[in-house]
């Protein structure tokens, strides 16, 4: 895509200034690595004390107005965009610089500067320049490596957590062991109480009923 754009626009004839045209020069190509770019448009015309309009367009047919500023050098200028671009800019004696931010890969295209003198008459603008190809590169984010301090803190927390977990396990085992011993002692005491011989209670003596002794001698006589 970029090669086709270069072939299509790099061989345009040089802009020839005429009485009704302004000469504008741009860099042929800008590479964007951090989603921001500054595009300077140099013109050979004295805009001082004149009402003018400076704008930046996107696409081979300049269909999208990226950024624009209206005014003159005696009043503050506000760069703005009506198409969703994050733009700002700066005016110089012979240069208009457009600051574009938060660019995306799909916004890679050719961009054209346009300078117009609105007042006083006659109306003047520039011939279409060769343009500037803005190539927005895709960003690849690498995971940040933890610093030595954060790594040390992490391992300290891991060791402390392991010690606390081990201590909690020991306390749990000790409590369980004590509970089992206590339960066993209660069972032994209960069995001992059941096996202890009981003292017999008082028993009644059974006496034979009294019977008088018989005198066998009387029977003999």
Swiss-Prot record:
Topology feature Extracellular, residues: 20-150
Top-rank taxon: Eukaryota
Subcellular location, record wording: Cell membrane
Glycosylation sites: 38, 72, 93, 106, 130
Cytoplasmic side: 178-221
Transmembrane segments: 151-177
Keyword line: Cell membrane, Disulfide bond, Glycoprotein, Immunoglobulin domain, Membrane, Phosphoprotein, Receptor, Signal, Transmembrane, Transmembrane helix
Pfam families tied to this protein: V-set_2 (PF15910)
Keyword Cytoplasm attached: no
InterPro entries assigned: CD28, CTLA4/CD28, Ig-like_dom_sf, Ig-like_fold, Ig_V-set
Protein name: T-cell-specific surface glycoprotein CD28
Organism expressing this protein natively: Oryctolagus cuniculus (Rabbit)
